């Protein structure tokens, strides 16, 4: 357990924020278009629970994996962002199911350790282009929903992106009280 905490939370974080393509601002809301490199990711899903509870459970599973709960007992260190795939509901909330992803650290991309938890999977993901907006604080469901609405308004009807889901991203460990970075990503349609 200590290894999980030490390696996942206190160790160096490999940041993967993507390559900036363009940026803009509308009605006081800044947004960017960025390309995010493909590669190997570790993922897990939680269903049947409210977004905040499901996200926390899924993130803890992945922290255990990168902290050494894998067949190599490798404490890999943390990457950011933590990417939570969320699914909008009809009533301005998110559906009670999430898929959480972490990019496997660079030094393990060629041969990632096999998870010991059968709810955790290694997957190859293609590069994507997305539209994003950033905000601070400890993000909860209501924050992501609010900022997704702002991003949707900024992009307007002429920009094409996936509407059945979006990504809720966090870049910081839980013990960082100030200067926190969260984002909402809309995946661009090709």
From Swiss-Prot:
Q: Which UniProt keywords apply?
A: Cytoplasm
Q: What InterPro entries does the record tag this protein with?
A: Reg_factor_effector_dom_sf, SOUL_haem-bd
**Keyword Cytoplasm appears in the UniProt entry:** yes
Q: Which GO terms describe its cellular component?
A: cytoplasm
What PANTHER family does the database record attribute to this sequence? Answer: HEME-BINDING PROTEIN 1, HEME-BINDING PROTEIN-RELATED
What is said about its interaction partners and assembly?
A: Monomer.
Protein name as annotated? Heme-binding protein 1
Q: Encoded by which gene?
A: hebp1
């Amino acid at each position: 357990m200590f290894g999980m905490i030490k390696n996942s939370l206190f160790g160096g974080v490999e940041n993967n924020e993507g390559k900036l393509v363009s940026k803009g601002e509308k009605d006081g809301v800044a947004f960017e278009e960025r390309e995010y490199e493909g590669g190997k990711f570790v993922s897990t899903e939680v269903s049947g629970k409210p977004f905040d509870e499901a996200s926390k459970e899924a993130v803890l599973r992945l922290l255990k994996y990168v902290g050494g709960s894998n067949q190599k007992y490798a404490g890999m260190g943390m990457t950011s962002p933590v990417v939570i795939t969320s699914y909008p509901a009809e009533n301005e909330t998110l559906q009670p199911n999430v898929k959480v992803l972490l990019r496997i650290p660079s030094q393990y991309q060629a041969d990632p350790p096999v998870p010991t938890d059968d709810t955790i999977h290694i997957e190859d993901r293609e590069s994507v282009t997305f539209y994003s907006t950033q905000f601070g604080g400890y993000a909860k469901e209501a924050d992501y929903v609010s900022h997704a609405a702002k991003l949707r308004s900024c992009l307007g009807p002429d920009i094409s992106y996936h509407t059945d889901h979006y990504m809720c991203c966090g870049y910081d460990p839980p013990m960082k009280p100030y200067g926190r970075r969260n984002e909402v990503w809309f995946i661009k349609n090709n």
